[in-house]
Design a protein with these regions (language model features):
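Juxtamembrane extracytoplasmic/periplasmic/luminal helical "stalk" adjacent to the first N-terminal
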Residues: 1-48, 65-72, 156, 160-162
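Short hydrophobic alpha-helical segments used for membrane anchoring or interfacial signaling
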Residues: 34, 74-80, 162-170
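Extracytoplasmic/periplasmic sensor domains and loops in membrane signaling proteins
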Residues: 45-62, 67, 82, 86-117, ...
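Membrane-proximal N-terminal soluble sensing/regulatory segments of transmembrane proteins
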Residues: 45-50, 134-141, 162-168
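Short, small/polar residue-rich loop motifs at catalytic or cofactor-binding pockets
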Residues: 68-71, 124-125, 221-223
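Conserved beta-strands of PAS-like sensory domains
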Residues: 123-156, 230-248
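Juxtadomain coupling helices with adjacent low-complexity linkers
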Residues: 151-181, 246-249
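Short hydrophobic beta-strand micro-motif common in sensory/regulatory domains
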Residues: 225-227
Length: 249
């Protein structure tokens, strides 16, 4: 009884900690996006004024070198829904609004949107900011960040082993261009620094047993908890956290 209470307390504390890390990252992503959307050089990029040496990739590199955010992506879309710049790839000039419902909504009714979503590259934090020039709506800036700073924090500072498994619903769309290129039993794994040991262990198990965890599970000397990653009432992924019970205080 005492032991189960202890495990319940640890689980509850971890859930609070991780939800707090997620909210912090969401807000930081929004702060970067809001600042950048006001920048005149960002606005000029919509008009393809590439003769300037302004490149958001350099900002992404600076964030990588000086902050915990190692893979910040910037995406600029014009007011007709065409992608004019992606910092992480050379791909551009595609009419992205044709396959993005969220974009169609914002182009019709420009407003700030801050969310977690799954695209063709990854599960990401995404802040979408309408851009105006001389009070005229000219496009959208997206600032996109990943879950890796959160899972690194859990591994390095909390001594936990996290793995993020994106819902099977999104597996097919992630196959070709996924950020981590890691798949486990038909699930996309979203954290680059996932432990090989955990991958091997889960590959030998019935994954569904872990994805059904409501509170916690004790198995093979591990305390395992599952934190669903939700957006607008839809489950996008499960974050499983492993902690060796022999290392618990």
């Amino acid at each position: 009884e005492l032991l189960s209470q202890k495990y319940s307390n640890i689980t509850s504390n971890l859930q609070d900690k991780i939800n707090s890390l997620i909210e912090t990252k969401k807000n930081a992503t929004l702060a970067i996006a809001l600042t950048l959307a006001e920048n005149d050089k960002t606005k000029d990029m919509i008009f393809q004024e590439r003769n300037s040496d302004y490149d958001l990739n350099e900002l992404s590199e600076k964030l990588k070198n000086y902050t915990d955010y190692k893979n910040v992506w910037f995406h600029i879309i014009d007011s007709s829904g065409v992608s004019v710049y992606r910092s992480w790839t050379e791909d551009k000039n595609d009419k992205i609004k044709n396959y993005r419902l969220d974009l169609q909504e914002i182009l019709l009714n420009p407003k700030v949107k801050n969310s977690i979503s799954v695209g063709i590259y990854d599960i990401t934090f995404k802040s979408m900011i309408p851009i105006y020039k001389d009070e005229k709506f000219i496009g959208i800036l997206e600032c996109i960040t990943h879950f890796n700073s959160i899972t690194r924090e859990l591994r390095n500072n909390q001594m936990l082993e996290p793995i993020i498994l994106v819902d099977k619903l999104f597996t097919n769309q992630l196959r070709e261009n996924s950020f981590t290129k890691i798949f486990l039993q038909d699930y996309y794994v979203a954290n680059l620094s996932v432990s090989n040991e955990i991958l091997k262990y889960l590959d030998s198990q019935d994954l569904e047993e872990f994805l059904k965890i409501k509170d916690y599970l004790i198995k093979d000397e591990n305390l395992v908890i599952n934190i669903p990653i939700m957006e607008d009432g839809v489950k996008l992924a499960d974050m499983l956290i492993f902690q060796n019970i022999n290392k618990l205080n």
